[in-house]
Design a protein with these regions (language model features):
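Extracytosolic ligand-binding ectodomains
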Residues: 1-205
């Protein structure tokens, strides 16, 4: 959460915006009404939560107990596991970022997943697809760099990472995704907001 806090503060500063407050809670907290009350009293008109499934669910339950209906966004944290089961119907209000979503059961990669893991019966059984796509694409990028380097030597692979191009992943085709000054292969255009609808992660139009 702390690294996200720094990034969010920079983003607010860049836009000349102020925040109503920053509150913290532990992963095993079951009541965050006091923190949320302070934010509400400070005039917060929306919330951004950085937490994983269970603690985010507790935030939603606390909001329900307060009767505070406020827009809430998050990083990828709520996308995994049993979020809507833990948070209840109000969990569908949370908008979170994703890099990839399965929206078609005929998707070739989804079909392969079903063949590999028979317990996957519907699109709702894959939460989140982002985790699969990120890992799959990262593996392809490393493989391309190893092939380019002609070696499994670490420094050689690192240098080859700056030269790879045309790697077709699930999220996108990567053309020169890395430079010495930019180690992130994904940019703002590669993210989308989504939310749960009846257990399935759906993109927000």
């Amino acid at each position: 959460g702390e690294s996200n806090e720094k990034g969010l503060l920079k983003a607010l500063e860049k836009r000349g915006m102020e925040h109503a407050g920053i509150e913290k809670f532990e992963s095993n907290d079951v009541d965050v009404v006091p923190q949320l009350t302070r934010l509400k009293e400070n005039g917060a008109d929306s919330l951004f939560v950085v937490a994983n499934v269970a603690p985010t669910a507790q935030v939603i339950k606390s909001l329900d107990r307060m009767g505070w209906d406020v827009p809430i966004s998050s990083h990828w944290g709520p996308a995994g596991g049993r979020f809507t089961e833990l948070a209840g119907k109000s969990g569908e209000k949370v908008h979170f970022i994703q890099t990839y979503l399965f929206t078609d059961p005929a998707n070739p990669m989804f079909v392969k997943l079903q063949e590999k893991f028979p317990e996957i019966e519907t699109l709702a059984d894959v939460t989140p697809a982002t985790g699969i796509a990120n890992a799959y694409d990262a593996t392809l990028l490393i493989a391309a760099a190893i092939e380019k380097a002609g070696s499994t030597d670490g420094p050689a692979i690192r240098e080859a990472m700056y030269e790879i191009s045309g790697v077709e992943g699930m999220i996108k085709t990567y053309d020169k995704p890395f430079t010495p000054d930019d180690q992130d292969a994904l940019g703002p255009e590669d993210y989308t907001f989504a939310h749960f609808v009846e257990g399935q992660i759906i993109p927000i139009k």
